[in-house]
């Protein structure tokens, strides 16, 4: 039921965004940046204490996509995802050349023997993987929009894929909604002494969100928010 409500909320966001986009005179194309060997320094805005850079597109399962060329897209996990996942033991990435579908698994996080999948925001063939991240999963927590990227994808229909993702104000709404749901859930956890001090808009969320989640709740909670 929760997943259905989340998806209905996402569809509502897209409908509103489509309505307003029809009134715009100028349509801004997806931002292109330098190749992967010159990682951009993305200046993020803050929503509910979570970093939400404005020049990337977001899947509601908390992964992001950034256009590097008309068909090459870099993919990663957003700040909400890495804080909720916490310190993981490993991140399993797909193979180069593997075909991914938008909305299906892009990688697997493992913590204390429990696995949870992340969803791909884009469809296409895996061009490259972040081997440094596979060796050191902490990179994702330290720099989710930079050195902690997951993969790059050659997407023949990237333009259409990007239309299915959240950007700008819609991405901010979605992150705020996710942060609100997360706050409401903490009091329901058995044995929880107090909810984490998630900051309001403009603040910085605590980094140890995952550490305050009971082990027996972590898998279900991450799968709910990651839509996996």
What are these regions (language model features)?
Residues 1-228:
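Contiguous, well-folded functional domains in the mature portion of proteins
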């Amino acid at each position: 039921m929760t997943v259905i409500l989340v998806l209905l909320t996402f569809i509502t966001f897209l409908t509103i965004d489509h309505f307003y986009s029809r009134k715009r005179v100028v349509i801004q194309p997806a931002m292109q940046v330098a190749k992967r060997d010159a990682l951009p320094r993305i200046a993020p805005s803050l929503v509910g204490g979570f970093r939400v850079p404005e020049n990337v597109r977001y899947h509601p399962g908390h992964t992001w996509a950034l256009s590097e060329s008309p068909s090459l897209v870099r993919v990663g996990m957003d700040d909400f995802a890495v804080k909720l996942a916490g310190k993981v033991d490993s991140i399993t990435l797909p193979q180069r050349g593997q075909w991914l579908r938008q909305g299906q698994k892009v990688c697997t996080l493992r913590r204390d023997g429990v696995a949870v999948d992340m969803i791909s925001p884009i469809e296409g063939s895996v061009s490259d993987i972040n081997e440094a991240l596979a060796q050191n999963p902490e990179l994702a927590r330290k720099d989710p929009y930079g050195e902690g990227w997951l993969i790059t994808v050659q997407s023949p229909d990237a333009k259409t894929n990007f239309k299915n993702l959240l950007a700008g104000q819609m991405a901010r709404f979605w992150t705020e909604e996710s942060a609100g749901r997360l706050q409401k859930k903490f009091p329901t956890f058995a044995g929880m002494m107090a909810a984490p001090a998630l900051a309001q808009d403009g603040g910085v969320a605590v980094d140890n969100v995952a550490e305050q989640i009971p082990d027996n709740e972590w898998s279900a909670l991450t799968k709910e928010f990651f839509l996996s």
